[in-house]
């Protein structure tokens, strides 16, 4: 489970596009904390700190204790906006964490022991991943960093369903039969190329034989004409 992280912030008394631009000029980004049957709280957080947290991974599954001028609030990121060109964070939305309530988060799926899967290591199969994240509804202090899928012993043709994974009971929001990944047989490019080349050679041979037969028939006709 992810540990709660501290995030320093500054309370904002002005909102809107003009106020947001002013915040960004100061090396911060605007953010808001909402939910928990309380009024939204506008804050600003350090740009470099926000960028580091977002690009480090696991940002949206981490609970933060946000300290805005001495007022501390536990919250989890629900969304963020990035500049489409530079990738710089522009805004973050936080959801208040309330005791006794659950949150829905998308937890990344990590595949381990791929080198111990005979279908991949010895037989050249390919791991086809259908779900890179799983949506879980859990208590904030029970959010896993990632969901591990053990590939040891897996063979070509094996299908891994959500029900095969070790998840906190009753937390997965999808269906138990959802396919997470499967092992596909290798694509035999060499055999395909050889088959194609053989087909081309056969067609060329047939064309050559047909041309030879036509030439022989024409020569016979010419001979018959000259003898007549």
UniProtKB/Swiss-Prot annotation:
Any matching Pfam family: Ribosomal_L25p
UniProt GO MF annotations: 5S rRNA binding; structural constituent of ribosome
Protein name per its UniProtKB record: Large ribosomal subunit protein bL25
Tree of life domain: Bacteria
GO cellular component terms listed in the entry, alphabetical order: cytosolic large ribosomal subunit
Key words, A-Z: Ribonucleoprotein, Ribosomal protein, RNA-binding, rRNA-binding
Function of the protein: This is one of the proteins that binds to the 5S RNA in the ribosome where it forms part of the central protuberance.
Region feature Disordered, mapped onto this chain: 196-228
PANTHER family: RIBOSOMAL PROTEIN L25/GLN-TRNA SYNTHETASE, ANTI-CODON-BINDING DOMAIN-CONTAINING PROTEIN, RIBOSOMAL PROTEIN L25_GLN-TRNA SYNTHETASE, ANTI-CODON-BINDING DOMAIN-CONTAINING PROTEIN
Organism: Methylorubrum extorquens (strain PA1)
């Amino acid at each position: 489970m992810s540990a709660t992280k501290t995030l320093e912030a500054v309370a904002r008394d002005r909102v809107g596009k003009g106020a947001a631009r002013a915040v960004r000029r100061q090396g911060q980004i605007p953010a808001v904390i909402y939910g928990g049957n309380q009024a939204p709280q506008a804050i600003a957080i350090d740009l470099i700190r926000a960028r580091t947290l977002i690009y480090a991974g696991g940002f949206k599954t981490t609970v933060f204790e946000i300290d805005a001028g001495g007022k501390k609030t536990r919250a989890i990121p629900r969304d963020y906006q990035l500049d489409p060109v530079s990738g710089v964070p522009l805004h973050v939305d936080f959801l208040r964490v309330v005791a006794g309530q659950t949150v829905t988060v998308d937890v990344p799926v990590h595949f381990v022991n791929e080198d111990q899967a005979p279908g991949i290591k010895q037989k050249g199969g390919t791991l086809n991943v259908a779900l890179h994240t799983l949506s879980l509804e859990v208590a904030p202090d029970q959010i896993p960093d990632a969901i591990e899928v053990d590939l040891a012993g897996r063979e070509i043709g094996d299908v891994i369903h959500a029900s095969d994974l070790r998840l906190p009971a009753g937390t997965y929001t999808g269906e138990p039969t959802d396919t997470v990944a499967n092992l596909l047989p290798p694509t035999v490019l060499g055999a395909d190329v050889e088959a194609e080349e053989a087909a081309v050679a056969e067609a060329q041979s047939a064309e050559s034989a047909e041309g030879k037969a036509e030439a022989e028939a024409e020569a016979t006709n010419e001979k018959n004409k000259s003898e007549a």
